[in-house]
Design a protein with these regions (language model features):
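N-terminal and secondary-structure boundary signal
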Residues: 1-326, 330-343, 347, 351, ...
Length: 386
């Protein structure tokens, strides 16, 4: 059976974090089961973009520092790595993101090494999905002796939730990520990409920062929520299943996790997941706001019914009053659906991946309710629905 440790932790105080994390790892078998002196240990953080740690958009720098210090005390060489989403002037903003989140400072003070996946080279792997024959993942993932996943507990405007399973998308360096969004335009097919990564990049541990979570329209434009939790497991899907239960969401309602279930990346049956730590049952997060696009599982499996019942849907729209004209949305759109000058979105080619909303650091891309009946009629006219 899979085990998920859930710890109560109310602040990013270093010693308190270390105590809770060490206790959780003991409940999973102890650090000696996972790392040894001299090991090169890569901490795969969530560094979606140049956001501060207090924004709840990235794994908090003090959370990363706590894990790094524990590993350094055990004689490990510690790397901190990721590749941010989006593009500024045709270049992924990862270097800027490491500074904005406070990782550079933490790494320097803890004797850790920053690994910018955009500039460290790639390794070719063979994915199991049918999207393409080859996939290129960041080289440090394979150079490290041990890889530990440090996801952030967040909602996602397109995928409903992002956690341990989805955090691995940052293993794809730089602007290659946009290509995969284009190849896998919906959450279910995107989940195939994530499963491919998990089957090629072997993560030993998953330690989720849920001390301060993000609710609402995550993964960057949502609101902070004091979840006061740290979740730990060797099983990414079991961890996500437990986290979703806290939100009152069934794992089957989050399509990006379907491929992980089908390929047995982990356990998704709550009856086969042991809960340990400060909690012996899964606690509920009260008044936690889910994304506007969230639908109950009763509607989820009937696409025709969704188009009739879900009369209004959310669609991205640029608020020009908030827009800084940085063009991250324009350069990050895999379908090139956003006009550089007017910031108008061509909904005829938009695949609703929400990259524009996800990667705007100024919350200028908003999700608006649209008359979906008009969209259906337009789609029929254009031959989109047959």
């Amino acid at each position: 059976m899979a085990k998920v440790v859930i710890q109560e932790c109310r602040e990013y105080e270093l010693n308190g974090l270390m105590i809770k994390i060490n206790d959780g790892i003991e409940r999973l078998g102890g650090w000696d089961l996972f790392v040894h002196p001299g090991d090169k240990v890569l901490l795969k953080v969530n560094l979606i973009g140049p956001k501060s740690s207090d924004s709840a958009a990235v794994t908090h720098s003090e959370f990363v520092r706590a894990v790094a210090r524990i590993l350094k005390q055990r004689g490990c060489e510690v790397w901190i790595g990721d590749s941010s989403g989006g593009a500024i002037g045709g270049i992924a903003p990862t270097a800027k993101s490491f500074r904005a989140a406070g990782y550079e400072k933490a790494a320097m003070e803890e004797g850790a090494v920053i690994k910018n996946f955009d500039s460290e080279g790639v390794i070719e792997v063979s994915p199991n999905s049918m999207h393409e024959e080859k996939m290129y993942l960041a080289k440090p993932i394979f150079d490290a002796d041990v890889v530990i996943n440090l996801p952030k507990f967040k909602t996602h405007s397109s995928c409903i939730y992002t956690g341990a399973v989805k955090n691995v998308f940052g293993c794809i360096p730089g602007l290659r990520k946009a290509r995969y969004h284009k190849m896998a335009p919906n959450p279910e097919s995107f989940g195939e990409i994530l499963a491919d990564i998990h089957q090629n990049a072997k993560f030993k541990l998953h330690i989720m920062d849920g001390v301060i979570a993000m609710q609402g329209e995550g993964p960057t434009a949502g609101d902070v929520y004091p979840a006061n939790k740290i979740l730990m497991s060797t099983d990414p899907l079991a961890l996500d299943t437990a986290a979703l239960k806290m939100l009152g969401v069934e794992v089957g309602e989050v399509a990006i996790l379907n491929a992980a279930k089908e390929r047995k990346i982990g356990e998704s049956n709550l009856e086969d997941i042991i809960i340990d730590g400060d909690y012996k049952t899964i606690p509920k997060l009260d008044e936690f706001k889910l994304p506007k696009r969230y639908k109950s599982g009763k509607k989820r499996n009937n696409k025709v019914l969704i188009k009739v019942i879900d009369f209004f849907k959310t669609a991205p729209k640029v608020n020009r009053k908030k827009c800084r004209n940085c063009n991250v949305c324009v350069e990050s759109c895999p379908m090139k659906a956003i006009d550089r000058d007017t910031k108008q979105i061509d909904y005829r080619v938009c695949i609703e991946c929400m990259c524009c909303h996800e990667l705007c650091m100024y919350k200028a891309v908003e999700l608006k309710k649209e008359n979906f009946l008009a969209g259906i009629l337009t789609g029929i006219k254009l031959g989109k629905y047959r």
